[in-house]
Curated annotation (Swiss-Prot):
It comes from Trichodesmium erythraeum (strain IMS101). Residues 4-146 form the RNase H type-1 domain. GO terms for biological process: DNA replication, removal of RNA primer. The keyword Metal-binding applies. Its cofactor is Mg(2+). It holds the Pfam family RNase_H. This is Ribonuclease H. Belongs to the RNase H family. It is found in: Cytoplasm.
């Protein structure tokens, strides 16, 4: 008998002032039993790294393999996962093609590993269009990016 997987909904967003510049991410995790909000930031990073970090940190919170409905306003993430780009980049030693390297291989590797543990359905939501949970994630991300004494994003530098 197989164990029924828990269904989880995750909303994520990343923000960066300057790109590169100080950045942050915001996450909302919804389950049958609770709502959890998380955020964090780095002093020098990019918007795409913060979008990726939001998804990674959200998935890292799940203690058991789960069915995840993940909502992000990052077409970069949705397309790279659903169109198989990220898996191809990894298979090609983190190259997009023969001469161009894939960006953020440290984070893409983590994300692909996490996706192999869970059943993740990625969905794109239009940013700043009134989606309440996405708007809240944006506020969390911006606030996190404005904190003092943010750590370094070692993968970026």
């Amino acid at each position: 008998m197989t164990e029924k997987r828990t269904e989880i909904t995750i909303y994520t967003d990343g923000a960066c002032s300057g790109n590169p510049g100080p950045g942050g991410y915001g996450i909302i995790i919804l389950s049958e039993k609770k709502r959890q909000e998380l955020s964090g930031g780095y002093k020098l990073t990019t918007n795409n790294r913060m979008e990726l970090m939001a998804v990674i940190v959200g998935l890292e919170q799940l203690e058991i393999p789960s069915i995840v409905n993940l909502y992000t306003d990052s077409k970069y993430i949705v397309d790279a996962v659903t169109k198989g780009w990220a898996k191809r980049w990894r298979a090609n030693s983190w190259k997009r093609n023969k001469k161009d390297k894939a960006m953020n291989p440290d984070l893409w590797g983590k994300l692909l590993d996490l996706c192999s543990k869970h059943q993740v359905e990625f969905s794109w939501v239009r940013g700043h269009s009134g989606n309440i949970e996405n708007e809240r994630c944006d506020k969390l991300a911006v606030k996190a990016s404005q904190k003092l004494d943010l750590p370094s994003d070692l993968g970026y530098q």
